[in-house]
Amino acid sequence: MEKTKLKIILLGDSGVGKTSLLKRYNDKDFKQLHNSTIYVDLVTKEICIAERQVILQIWDTAGQERFKSLPSRFYRDTDCCVLVYDVNTLKTFESIDNWHDEFIKQANPETPTKFPFVLMGNKTDVNNGKPRVVAKEIADQWCGSKGNIVYFETSAKAKINVEEAFLEIAKKALTNERQIDDMERYRSVVPTIEKETPRSRCSC
């Protein structure tokens, strides 16, 4: 059976836990300290969705400001974009708008308002009893303003919603890939139909 490859990109500020989320999902492991992603890192994972084998190609990106201008080719052919912030750090949430707009600019999807994004508010376990900085309602409002983006609150350390989030990400990526395939097939068929349809002639 042919396996479908799906490209997924994780974007967000440095330190929000993108690498930890990916390690928890792929390796079922968590490390308190690990080396920061220098540029980009690729993880592949094979799963089954609706009796279809898919290979997730998940790109983990560095979050430093100097890496925000990744080349356009890096964004091309992405099937789902995951935006990650730290629920305890306001700046990382405020940066989500920039990451969202940068992706739209670089990837240039055919229908930007319908492209599948998923927002992840990470580190829900580390507020140490203090009130969290970014309330869930604020994140929900942001998602609504962008066309009802799906939102998950996660913790890589406590294993909260990580599997559920990546399953939804994979489903959205697969749906997007199918829609692109359908559009490409339609475009290849329409010119053929137009070419083969004889023009009507009026008899005088």
From Swiss-Prot:
Record's keyword terms, sorted: Cell membrane, GTP-binding, Lipoprotein, Membrane, Methylation, Nucleotide-binding, Prenylation, Protein transport, Transport
GO biological process: protein transport
UniProt xrefs under SUPFAM superfamilies: P-loop containing nucleoside triphosphate hydrolases
One MF term in the entry's GO annotations: GTPase activity
Gene Ontology cellular component list: plasma membrane
Motif window: Effector region: 34-42
Gene3D superfamilies found in the cross-reference section: P-loop containing nucleotide triphosphate hydrolases (3.40.50.300)
Cellular compartments annotated: Cell membrane
InterPro entries in the cross-refs: P-loop_NTPase (IPR027417), Small_GTP-bd (IPR005225), Small_GTPase (IPR001806)
Chief localisation class: membrane
Pfam families documented for this protein: Ras
Residues with a covalently attached lipid (S-geranylgeranyl cysteine): C202, C204
Membrane topology: Lipid-anchor
Residues recorded with modification Cysteine methyl ester: C204
Annotated binding of GTP, by residue: 12-19, 60-64, 122-125, 155-156
Highest taxon of source: Eukaryota
PANTHER family, sorted: RAB FAMILY, RAS-RELATED PROTEIN RABG1-RELATED
Function: Intracellular vesicle trafficking and protein transport.
Family to which this protein belongs: Belongs to the small GTPase superfamily. Rab family.
Protein name: Ras-related protein RABG1
Classification lineage: Eukaryota, Viridiplantae, Streptophyta, Embryophyta, Tracheophyta
